Amino acid sequence: MLFFFKAPKFMYGSIKRKNLCFATSTIDISEEDNTDTKTSSRIIVVTSGKGGVGKTTATANIGMSIARLGYKVVLIDADIGLRNLDLLLGLENRILYTVMDVFEGQCRLDQALIRDKRWKNLSLLSISKNRQRYNVTRKNMQNLVKALANLNFRYILIDCPAGIDVGFINAISPAQEALIVTTSEIPAIRDADRVAGLLEANGIFDIKLLINRVRSDLIQKNDMMSVRDVQEVLGVPLLGAIPEDNQVIVSTNRGEPLVLKKKLTLSGIAFENAARRLVGKQDYFVDLDSPYKGVFQKIFDLFSGN
């Protein structure tokens, strides 16, 4: 028996904010550009505060899932100097140029975009490999995102650096929406709460929550906070909950997101469902706090046809 509950209507709200300009072969990084250009692009920053909670894994899998739904998607790896998004997508050997090269006029923006061979409507853009994060300003990020919107990307997902320093502030500056990734551990929840406050302080109020590495066995023993408890503590609309899955390690080493596996694991199903809710195609959650033993396996059987 499966349990579902209706997603709140307000979780799909969006705040319109201005984007910035794009030049022909390089990104215009002038400080004078105040052009207010409307765009249909959704600009979403994926953040966590605490490192190691699965933020980059979530970005890769949700981004890939959205692309599989038919939308044009670009993932920006803004974790400067510690990039890993290319590894999770299996694109590490194809990066020739980065955004820093575009800023410096060494290449065009389209040359720095790496298109996924499996899904042509998914692209990756790395900010840099070895430069300090402080070299990328808010204006740089805003102009970059406007340039990508002008290339008709429907979804622009920014994989934000961990922490709450200057790199975080610069990375979130062009975003309209935010997705906070956390686990049920107390330190991660505390950091997520602080990040939510910083996002609101910087004008981002459309915030959603993704709870990662959920273990039903620990929840039933009261050794882990439930999904509902975490959501209530943070007071942020819930996008989804991802069960613990050992296949994440295998997926990372192979450079293949979980959502591309022929036989989806429970976490792969959960990532796909979260992506569908993000684009407004699914209104219901699977209740991972169900007291019935084996609910995860029942969900898996339902989607895998067993």
From Swiss-Prot:
Species the sequence originates in: Tupiella akineta (Green alga)
Annotated family: Belongs to the ParA family. MinD subfamily.
Lineage of the organism: Eukaryota, Viridiplantae, Chlorophyta, Ulvophyceae, OUU clade
Localization, UniProt: Plastid, Chloroplast
Pfam family name, one: CbiA
Keyword annotations: ATP-binding, Cell cycle, Cell division, Chloroplast, Nucleotide-binding, Plastid, Septation
Record carries keyword Signal: no
Physiological role: ATPase required for the correct placement of the division site.
InterPro entries named among the record's database cross-references: CobQ/CobB/MinD/ParA_Nub-bd_dom (IPR002586), MinD (IPR010223), MinD_FleN (IPR025501), P-loop_NTPase (IPR027417), ParA/MinD_ATPase (IPR050625)
Cited PANTHER family: SEPTUM SITE-DETERMINING PROTEIN MIND HOMOLOG, CHLOROPLASTIC, SEPTUM SITE-DETERMINING PROTEIN MIND HOMOLOG, CHLOROPLASTIC-RELATED
Record-level Gene Ontology MF annotations: ATP binding; ATP hydrolysis activity
CDD domains (UniProt xref): MinD
GO cellular component, one term: cytoplasmic side of plasma membrane
Protein name, per record: Putative septum site-determining protein MinD
Claim: Repeat is one of the keywords in the record: no
Annotated ATP binding sites: 50-57
Gene Ontology BP, a term: cell division
Gene, per the UniProt record: minD
